[in-house]
Amino acid sequence: CLDVYMSKNFFGGESRIFHMKDTKNRIIPLTIQSRFDLYNGFTHYQLSLNGTLNVGEEYLVFDEHCKTCVAKYSHIVKTERFAKEFTYDKDDLGVTYTPKQTTFKVWAPTALSVSVGYVLNGHKQVVALKREEHGVFALTIKKDLNGVHYSYLVRVNGEYKGVTDPYTCFTGANSQYSVIVAVSYTHLRAHE
């Protein structure tokens, strides 16, 4: 079920048809199941589609007047299907560092894309992670990245968002960026 809210300031909130388009420009017809006039100047449409959506794909919703909006993921993450398809039980999320390579892994099933940005030897780099099973994005860089600052650029619900690594313990001032740290070099004392 898709919920669409149209302002009555735009064609009186009326649309006789809706469809979606994915990132490959495939058209997906939508069926109006119900229509409600709301008190706040909007019309609420409940729409259905024949078939299933691919979680992580980005879809544009079109009305009959060619006005578009990005379909946003919200309630789908609370479904049994989502839990079955995207539960990830491994403990390798975040950064796995060795002096020869660093692997980045992020669980972001509703994201269209994830990139990592970092600075090495004064040069800014932005590299796309590859989508794998269960909504995990991963990338291995075959360089020594100890001490490097990094953050992720995630495209979800039609917007790019810069975020720090949710799996790391090492961040910069005010958590503005994450830091790759060789834990063996930290020499933490045991808690007494």
Language model segments and positions:
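A short glycine/threonine-centered beta-strand motif
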Residues: L2-E14, A108-T110
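Aromatic- and glycine-rich beta-strand/loop motifs that create alpha-glucan
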Residues: D22-H44, T98, T103-G147, L153-F170
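Short, aromatic- and glycine-rich surface loops/edge beta-strands on solvent-exposed regions
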Residues: N54-K67, V148-V156
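A general sequence property marking short-to-moderate contiguous segments
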Residues: E58-K90
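Conserved small/polar residues in nucleotide/adenosyl-binding loops
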Residues: T186-E192
